[in-house]
């Protein structure tokens, strides 16, 4: 049992007088006056340095009292029957799949604990999109606990959106189409079910942080007068164990700071994670109450069901409240796993007062005492209170039993999370527990059950969803396409750079500044930074377009007279996320999926230190890809040697390797501003005009060097991954290419292309004929080559020739490839080098160092001398 320390009472008589006076105050002047006096006393205690502060925990009872819960607006009996049917179909779906194929997996216990939390939302609160017209509700955003996906499928089956064949192919996405069915993904995956799921939540922690930044982005849209999101909510149903993920709780203070009363979390506190109790020796609800209250959230505890109301009313001595306060979660889990007789003896049998409360109750009645998260009346009261609350985000801490209703096979068991098979007796017990109209044969045969279309249950289900906008989850894609301005309107300086020195980061910021001025596209651009705008030369945008702030700017900034003044504004356009890459990528995802979530296309540009992208928040980027995000990720200060002095933790040599693993990510490493202009133009057209489900990753460098004009006809090669770059066109003396019998081909990308060009000049001076290719995307070249291979393997008559093979066919000699990334990046195209050509790769494998660029490039062997040395080696050792 939990020991709660208390200060000794040195004067009980005086204490009683204070207590009586306070009770009289509440009775005569009401709770508002009582709260005011308590606040005054707390202020006085602080001023007198008493050393006391109010505790963040409230009694272990429901926040919404019986007198405040209102009248339940639904038909409780029908809703309970519907819930029981959905529970059964969810269970049958998982057990069927695992009886047929034991390796498929799935979860029964999570949805069993959350079913009523879901159903109350579906029947009364979760609003679907009515349409995109004026006055039409654009829908709530609902993040579903991933392990409860079977329950969502089971409800969609009753709604007629999924067939019995679909349910029979749970987790069989490849097999299902062969029999005309839709395979159901394991968890919410928009990529796999693009008309169904909106938000991927399968990776713990990603859903919670995403929900916060989606709620904030809705305020951003409203405050910038782009879309009125009033009346829309973001609901998130998450697990208590999931709250241990850093991403789950890292943005709690942002939600309260922004006053996001459009955000409601429901934390399913079933007290169990995969291996055992979440807090066996403590109480997770108390811990989460302190956490959320301290972070400034409105906390609603949903602990006990209606069956407990009479017990609390009769608890005149406080024995029940004290016993519950002293029971740790590990013991509470044991009570959930045991029957009524055990609970009578071990809980109510602790003392005579508790025993008296249970007198007259049967063991079955004790066994059926519901926790708050299983009582539809209490859930509705909590949801209604959360929906009405203003000024703060709300969290509902719902007490449930994991595996609720699974009886001795699963309820409260340590192993219940992985339970996916039940025997005949267990199935019949489940049927009986929920009064399902199934024969023994149907129950043991795992027959799906769907009431007749004209039944009271089906009519009720439809009648309650209709005023809420229809069924959900439902992912929409209807969105107006955006025109993209001509490339010359914002990037002419890059296309015709004429040898001017600048970094590609500087060039990008100049392009972005031009794009922001476009009347059509400009307002839809969302610049996002994680406290690095000044590093990237973007400070001029502070004054030009402002930094978004939900309260405007309540102070005069120190630099108010400067052209670079730090200007915050209610309608500011920049999302300045502070030192939070997790928050910044969540904001980027919210903007990059706005076309689907809100029916409004937005174009986010998130610029960051490239090392702190895929390496730091790769899981969030993967989830964004699953969600079919559209936008730009700009990995600035990229390259292991280009960043120079920052050293091991900051120098990126791997981001392009990771980016290549994401199927809908197009990754580019342009060396020159003209190349980048072509890439940005193509990306915008592909994402907001053609509306394709891709996003772009472009690396930018902070090294200043001469920028050549983009060669005529190079655009196709830039986009496909490489083109022949003739370095002689940049030479001031207009020399002709020398004629030689010795040939070598050099490939380079990013800032290392400048070293490759220098190497070409060194080799040319030695009498070699050198061709230089600028590689803008190793991953696009590799994918193109792999696609040709796949077509050939499939027996297609014209599988095509890989682009890199075509380009190299116009060159001769061994091929040397150099990058500022690990060698695995250029190695990805080895299979597509023309037969008989020697291929050597140079890269920056290993940890970074702090030094000058020249020293770093020499150390890693990617400077001009090293590239030239590799070329000589290849020629001397039989290179073709």
What are these regions (language model features)?
Residues 130, 218-228, 593-613, 632, ...:
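Glycine-rich phosphate/pyrophosphate-binding loops
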Residues 4, 21-24, 71-79, 97-106, ...:
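Glycine- and acidic
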Residues 176-200, 206, 220-231, 249-445, ...:
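Thiamine diphosphate
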Residues 236-237, 265, 528, 634, ...:
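Residue-level marker for buried hydrophobic side chains located in beta-strands
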Residues 236-239, 243, 619-640, 645:
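A structural-propensity feature for long, helix-poor, extended segments
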Residues 2-159, 163, 430, 502-518, ...:
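N-terminal amphipathic, basic-rich helices that act as targeting or association modules
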Residues 74-86, 90-100, 107-258, 281-282, ...:
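Cofactor-binding active-site loop characterized by glycine-rich and histidine/acidic residues
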Residues 72-90, 111, 129-134, 455-630, ...:
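Non-catalytic terminal/interface segments that mediate subunit docking, oligomerization
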């Amino acid at each position: 049992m939990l020991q709660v320390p208390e200060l000794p009472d040195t004067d009980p008589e005086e204490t009683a007088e204070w207590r009586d006076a306070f009770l009289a105050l509440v009775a005569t002047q009401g709770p508002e006056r009582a709260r005011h006096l308590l606040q005054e006393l707390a202020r006085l205690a602080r001023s007198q340095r008493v050393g006391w502060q109010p505790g963040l925990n409230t009694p272990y009872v429901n926040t919404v009292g019986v007198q405040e819960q209102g009248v339940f607006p639904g038909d409780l009996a029908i809703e309970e029957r519907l819930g029981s049917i959905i529970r059964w179909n969810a269970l049958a779906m998982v057990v069927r799949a695992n009886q047929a194929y034991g390796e498929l997996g799935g979860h029964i216990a999570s949805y069993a604990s959350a079913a009523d939390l879901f159903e109350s939302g579906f029947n009364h609160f979760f609003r679907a999109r009515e349409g995109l017209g004026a006055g039409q509700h654009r829908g709530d955003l609902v993040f579903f606990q991933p392990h409860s996906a079977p329950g969502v499928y089971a409800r969609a089956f009753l709604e007629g959106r999924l067939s019995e064949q679909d349910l029979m192919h749970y987790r069989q996405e490849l097999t299902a189409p062969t029999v005309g069915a839709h395979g159901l993904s394991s968890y919410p995956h928009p990529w796999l079910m693009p008309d169904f799921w909106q938000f991927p939540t399968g990776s713990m922690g990603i859903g919670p942080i995403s929900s916060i930044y989606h709620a904030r982005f809705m305020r951003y849209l409203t405050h910038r007068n782009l879309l009125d999101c009033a009346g829309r909510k973001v609901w998130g149903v998450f697990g208590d164990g999931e709250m241990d993920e850093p991403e789950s709780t890292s943005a709690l203070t942002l939600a309260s700071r922004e006053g996001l009363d459009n955000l409601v979390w429901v934390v399913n506190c079933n007290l169990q994670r995969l291996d055992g109790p979440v807090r066996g020796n403590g109480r997770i609800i108390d811990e989460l109450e302190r956490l959320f209250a301290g972070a400034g959230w409105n906390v609603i505890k949903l602990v006990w069901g209606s069956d407990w109301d009479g017990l609390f009313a009769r608890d005149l001595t406080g024995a029940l409240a004290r016993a519950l306060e002293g029971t740790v979660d590990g013991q509470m889990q044991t009570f959930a796993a045991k029957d009524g007789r055990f609970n009578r003896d071990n809980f109510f049998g602790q003392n005579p007062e508790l025993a008296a409360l249970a007198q007259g109750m049967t063991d079955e009645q004790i066994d059926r005492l519901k926790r708050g998260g299983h009582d539809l009346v209490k859930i509705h009261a909590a949801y209604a209170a959360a929906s009405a609350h203003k000024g703060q985000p709300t969290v509902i801490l719902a007490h449930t039993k994991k595996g609720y209703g699974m009886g001795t096979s699963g309820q409260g068991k340590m192993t219940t999370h992985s339970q996916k098979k039940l025997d005949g007796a267990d199935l019949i017990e489940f049927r009986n527990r929920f009064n399902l109209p199934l024969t023994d044969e149907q129950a043991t045969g795992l027959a799906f059950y769907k009431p007749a279309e004209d039944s009271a249950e089906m009519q009720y289900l439809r009648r309650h969803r209709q005023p809420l906008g229809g069924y959900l989850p439902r992912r929409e894609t209807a969105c107006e396409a955006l025109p993209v301005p001509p490339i010359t309107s914002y990037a002419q300086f890059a296309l015709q750079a004429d040898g001017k020195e600048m970094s590609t980061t500087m060039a990008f910021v100049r392009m972005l500044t031009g794009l922001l001025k476009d009347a059509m596209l400009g307002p839809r651009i969302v610049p996002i930074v994680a406290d690095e705008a000044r590093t990237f030369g973007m400070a001029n945008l502070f004054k030009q377009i402002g930094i978004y702030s939900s309260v405007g700017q309540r102070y005069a900034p120190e630099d108010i007279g400067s052209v670079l003044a730090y200007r915050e504004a209610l309608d500011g356009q920049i999302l300045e996320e502070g030192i939070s890459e997790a928050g910044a990528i969540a904001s980027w995802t919210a903007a990059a999926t706005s076309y689907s979530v809100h029916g409004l296309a937005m174009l986010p540009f998130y610029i960051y230190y490239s090392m702190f992208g895929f390496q730091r928040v790769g899981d969030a980027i993967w989830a964004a890809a699953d969600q079919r995000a559209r936008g730009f990720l700009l990995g600035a200060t990229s390259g292991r040697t280009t960043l120079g002095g920052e050293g091991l933790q900051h120098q990126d040599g791997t981001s392009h390797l990771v980016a290549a693993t994401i199927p809908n990510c197009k990754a580019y490493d342009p060396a020159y501003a003209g190349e980048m202009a072509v890439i940005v133009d193509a990306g915008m057209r592909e994402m907001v005009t053609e509306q394709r489900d891709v996003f772009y990753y472009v690396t930018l460098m902070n090294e200043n060097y001469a920028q050549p004009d983009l060669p005529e006809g190079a655009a196709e090669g830039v986009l496909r991954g490489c083109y022949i770059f003739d370095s002689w066109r940049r030479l001031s003396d207009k020399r002709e290419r020398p004629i030689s019998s010795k040939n070598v081909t050099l490939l380079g990308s990013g800032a290392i292309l400048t070293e490759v060009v220098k190497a070409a000049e060194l080799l040319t001076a030695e009498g070699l004929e050198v061709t230089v290719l600028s590689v803008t995307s190793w991953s696009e070249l590799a994918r193109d080559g792999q696609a040709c291979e796949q077509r050939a393997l499939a027996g297609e008559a014209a599988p095509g020739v890989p682009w890199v093979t075509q380009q190299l066919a116009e060159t001769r000699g061994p091929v040397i490839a150099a990058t500022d990334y690990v060698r695995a990046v250029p190695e990805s195209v080895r299979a597509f080098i023309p037969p008989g050509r020697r291929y050597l790769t140079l890269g920056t494998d290993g940890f970074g160092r702090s030094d000058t660029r020249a020293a770093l490039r020499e150390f890693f062997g990617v400077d001009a001398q090293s590239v030239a040395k590799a070329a000589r080696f290849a020629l001397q050792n039989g290179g073709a």
